[in-house]
């Protein structure tokens, strides 16, 4: 088929559809943030000291599509795609396209526009990319064997925003929304040579991005694009990411071809029911569906395998229908699994996974196969509710056990308590007798999440979006998950659902990250609500069905910061009760059984986190987070690096954060250059991020059940709200978080100097010892105290004693050491302190440079020794190219930004997919490199 003739036939059709896709504003909209009504004045835009270096367009090459096998009967259509603007469809001006990928991804890959992550390059990319239609196309061949199959289908796992799908000159149908799959039958149209074309339509309300600068202020946090949810609403621009010029439209997920003998599987979920508190067996219920695309009823045999467990079931599937299939232990006793390996979140056990292998046998042929990964885990939630006969009732809600009651809670019937905290009511017709009442141990009214009967002290962070240009490949995302696991995090919040993808959930499963999963709406009363609730519900339903088998997902939440509209609240809660019997629908990311979110700014006195903020479950708390100088140099041109420039502001250094920047000069002395600023600010980053987590540690199970950073992960090169930088580099914020979140931990509360041991593991600690020692900057001991024979039960906190710091002068270090009965050090936690009458840490600058020596202990372990007579401060490690000194990323180190006393040794571990030399640097340490 000739593509030129094909597109000529579609010219008038494309115009009509584009016109029909227009939407009018909702007349009853109460929210106010429509974003900018027009582009901001030129004089308020950020300016760079150097012009943008525009790339050269890469010459197009002929590339034929090759179908990449994914399973026995599934192929991925990746290579050979082309893309062009809709008004150039009749020309030769096509690009080799990146699929999966967005429109902008292709244009950057092909050298049309510069890398938007660098400097102010994003401003040089035209805004009208999100106001144009685009076409994708590819050609592929099918073998006689594939053409002989009874059924051939195309699966689109994610487009944005809308798409028409054309195959061999015929329109197959349309897809609307960024998170719904499209499934199209091509059985009667497929030939030896095939042409596939996709017409991409942008959202009707793309909005106008606000460009951050010192003159324009911080981002406006969205705008008109929120009307078009389900989509990536943050791509209009937020205060942590600029507007993405194409709004992430395109074929952003993979396209697959599936061949069967006419009977195929739908989405599958394995429901695991444990006899809690016992976990010695699990009842497995398999929920799936079978679809018969043939014109006659078919008797099939469903065969299943889970490890050593096998089962079969004969099923009749009526012609042209899709039927639900439920397999349970009552009918198949082998689905009662003995001694299962449980899926547990990071720090509480291993995230064990099983594969359910299903085959559908039709006669002597296998029609379809499917592999579903699942974990044996059961969720429950402690929270406070109102019942008709009792207010403030503390209950444990197990969605699986309570499913027969219908929807347990009515989130439209809320009691407002002090501080804006809301208590939900039991649904109409339910009372105390219907629920599991538990004692109030001081945690009322706050939410507690339990996995397999174990309370989980939730610590982690928000992902505003996985990647600004939606590179959601496993290769790109997995290092971030390794960093989260090694930071001892156990929860990621999928903020406004912007990180929804198969790879995201797969990696959460594998690395033990609980997922708080939002849908695609933001702040109630500020951000706009979606115009098309039917479209929203179709996407939401598909997400719940598609990803419901992932054990990591712990809650569904309708929006960020607020409740859904009354109609969406009713529809979402009913849908989730029907489609997912294992999880809680949580109606609000704050307020309902939660504390108010925030703060998001730097605290001059980190003790305020303890005295004011630390209570309940907080879904967002954050502080600025400037990365290392090495990462900054990859982020912007040298001329914009110092002094702080417009480019810093464009990369999220917001107005109102002056105190964070000023704190560097105030506490550590005026920064002389970029390197000086970045090495000094890491003290602030470490202390701030450690304090946020340690403040919640101080009230674990007394008044606190969880805290999530805003944010743990950056969507692009940023100087704000992150624990690591986009390039996988770790710095003070990361290691401060990692220290505070270690499963066995000793800390000194900054508000009252109480010394506390935290044990978030499932095993008790016995005969432990805690030593507190104060040192001056030369490493001279000033005071000491030790406590022995300490027992700390599993999953608990123990307050020990108050550190006696009165009378200490100048700058000094408080060192806490937790060791076991044999004297083995479990953890060390150091605090740099200001004594009476001391306002800063400028004395650090007068400490003589320390010398350190490294030696290799094993393939992955290195010993570092302080061979000088004073403390070596803020030691940081990197893997580097021994010839050039260039930092190699990712590389994972067991510790960083710690201090060594004179003569002290410390062993670190490193692992990386690359090889190189180990380099150590420090605040008062000259760089030292150990070649491997």
Residue ranges: model-predicted function:
Residues 1-11, 20-467, 471-491, 700-704, ...:
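Secreted/periplasmic carbohydrate-active enzymes, especially glycoside hydrolases
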Residues 226, 659-668:
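Active-site-adjacent bridging/hinge elements
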Residues 427, 434-435, 439, 491-655, ...:
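Substrate-binding/catalytic cleft of secreted carbohydrate-active enzymes
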Residues 14-15, 630, 914:
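Alpha-helical transmembrane segments and their juxtamembrane interfaces
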Residues 91, 248-249, 629, 657-661, ...:
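Alpha-helix initiation and N-capping motif
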């Amino acid at each position: 088929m000739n593509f030129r003739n094909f597109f000529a036939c579609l010219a008038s059709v494309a115009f009509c559809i584009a016109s029909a896709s227009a939407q009018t504003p909702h007349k009853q909209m109460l929210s106010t943030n429509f974003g900018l009504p027009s582009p901001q004045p030129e004089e308020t835009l950020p300016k760079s000291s150097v012009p943008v270096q525009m790339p050269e367009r890469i010459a197009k090459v002929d590339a034929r599509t090759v179908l990449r096998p994914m399973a026995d009967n599934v192929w991925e259509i990746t290579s050979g795609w082309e893309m062009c603007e809709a008004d150039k469809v009749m020309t030769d001006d096509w690009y080799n396209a990146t699929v999966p990928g967005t429109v902008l991804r292709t244009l950057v890959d092909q050298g049309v526009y510069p890398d938007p992550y660098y400097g102010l390059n994003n401003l040089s990319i035209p805004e009208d990319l999100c106001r144009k239609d685009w076409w994708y196309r590819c050609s592929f061949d099918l073998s006689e064997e594939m053409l002989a199959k009874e059924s051939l289908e195309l699966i689109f796992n994610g487009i944005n925003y809308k798409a028409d799908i054309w195959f061999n000159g015929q329109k197959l149908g349309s897809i609307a929304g960024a998170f719904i799959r499209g499934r199209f039958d091509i059985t009667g149209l497929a030939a030896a040579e095939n042409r596939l074309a996709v017409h991409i339509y942008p959202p009707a309300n793309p909005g106008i991005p606000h460009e951050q600068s010192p003159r324009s202020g911080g981002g406006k946090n969205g705008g008109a694009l929120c009307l078009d949810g389900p989509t990536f609403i943050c791509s209009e621009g937020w205060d942590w990411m600029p507007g993405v010029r194409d709004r992430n439209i395109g074929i952003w997920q993979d396209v697959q071809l599936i061949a069967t003998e006419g009977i195929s599987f739908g989405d599958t979920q394995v429901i695991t029911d444990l006899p809690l508190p016992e976990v010695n067996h699990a009842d497995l219920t398999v929920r799936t569906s079978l679809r018969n695309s043939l014109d006659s009823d078919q008797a099939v045999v469903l065969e299943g395998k889970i490890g050593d467990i096998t089962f079969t079931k004969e099923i009749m599937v009526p012609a042209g229908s899709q039927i639900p299939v439920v397999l349970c232990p009552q009918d198949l006793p082998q689905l009662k699994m003995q001694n299962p390996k449980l899926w547990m979140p990071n720090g509480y056990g291993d995230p064990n996974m099983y594969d359910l292998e299903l085959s559908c046998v039709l006669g002597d042929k296998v029609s379809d196969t499917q592999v579903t990964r699942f974990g044996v885990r059961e969720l429950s939630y402690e929270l406070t509710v109102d019942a008709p006969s009792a207010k403030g009732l503390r209950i444990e809600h197990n969605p699986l056990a309570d499913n027969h009651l219908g929807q347990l809670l009515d989130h439209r019937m809320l009691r407002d308590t002090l501080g804006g905290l809301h208590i939900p009511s039991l649904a109409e017709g339910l009372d105390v007798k219907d629920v599991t009442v538990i004692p109030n141990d001081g945690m009322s009214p706050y939410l507690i999440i339990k996995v397999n009967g174990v309370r989980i002290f939730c610590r982690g962070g928000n992902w505003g979006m996985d990647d600004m240009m939606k590179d959601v490949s496993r290769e790109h995302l997995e290092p971030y998950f390794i960093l989260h696991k090694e930071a001892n995090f156990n929860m990621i919040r999928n903020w406004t659902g912007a990180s929804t993808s198969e790879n995201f959930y797969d990696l959460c499963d594998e690395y033990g990250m609980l997922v708080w999963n939002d849908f695609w709406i933001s702040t109630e009363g500020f951000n706009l609500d979606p115009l098309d609730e039917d479209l929203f519900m179709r996407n939401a339903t598909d997400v719940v069905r598609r990803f419901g088998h992932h054990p990591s997902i712990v809650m569904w939440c309708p929006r960020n910061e607020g409740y859904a509209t009354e109609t969406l609240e009713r529809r979402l809660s009913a849908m989730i009760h029907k489609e997912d019997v294992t999880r809680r629908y949580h109606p609000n990311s704050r307020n309902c059984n939660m504390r108010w979110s925030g703060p998001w700014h730097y605290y001059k006195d980190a003790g305020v986190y303890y005295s004011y903020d630390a209570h309940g479950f907080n879904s967002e708390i954050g502080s600025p987070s400037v990365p290392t100088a090495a990462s900054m140099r990859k982020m912007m041109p040298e001329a914009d690096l110092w002094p702080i420039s417009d480019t810093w502001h464009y990369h999220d250094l917001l107005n109102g954060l002056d105190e964070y920047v000023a704190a560097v000069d105030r506490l550590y002395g005026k920064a002389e250059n970029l390197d000086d600023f970045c090495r000094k600010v890491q003290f602030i980053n470490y202390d701030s991020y450690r304090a946020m987590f340690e403040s919640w540690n101080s009230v674990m199970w007394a008044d606190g059940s969880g805290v999530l950073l805003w944010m743990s992960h950056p969507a692009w090169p940023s100087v704000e709200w992150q624990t690591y930088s986009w390039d996988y580099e770790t710095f003070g914020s990361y290691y401060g978080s990692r220290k505070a979140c270690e499963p066995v931990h000793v800390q000194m509360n900054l508000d009252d100097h109480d010394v506390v041991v935290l044990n978030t593991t499932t095993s008790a600690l016995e005969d432990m010892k805690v030593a507190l020692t104060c040192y001056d900057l030369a490493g001279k001991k000033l005071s000491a105290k030790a406590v022995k024979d300490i027992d700390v039960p599993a999953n608990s906190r123990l307050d020990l004693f108050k550190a006696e710091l009165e009378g200490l002068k100048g700058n000094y270090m408080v060192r806490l050491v937790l060791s076991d009965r044999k004297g083995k050090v479990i953890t060390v936690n150091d605090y740099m302190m200001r004594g009476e009458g001391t306002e800063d840490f400028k004395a650090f600058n007068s400490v003589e440079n320390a010398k350190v020596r490294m030696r290799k202990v094993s393939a992955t372990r290195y010993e570092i020794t302080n061979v000088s007579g004073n403390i070596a401060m803020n030691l940081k490690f990197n893997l580097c190219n021994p010839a050039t000194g260039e930092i190699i990323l990712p590389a994972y180190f067991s510790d960083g930004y710690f201090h060594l006393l004179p003569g002290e040794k410390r062993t670190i571990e490193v692992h990386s997919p690359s090889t190189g030399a180990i380099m150590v640097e420090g605040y008062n340490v000259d760089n030292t490199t150990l070649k491997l």
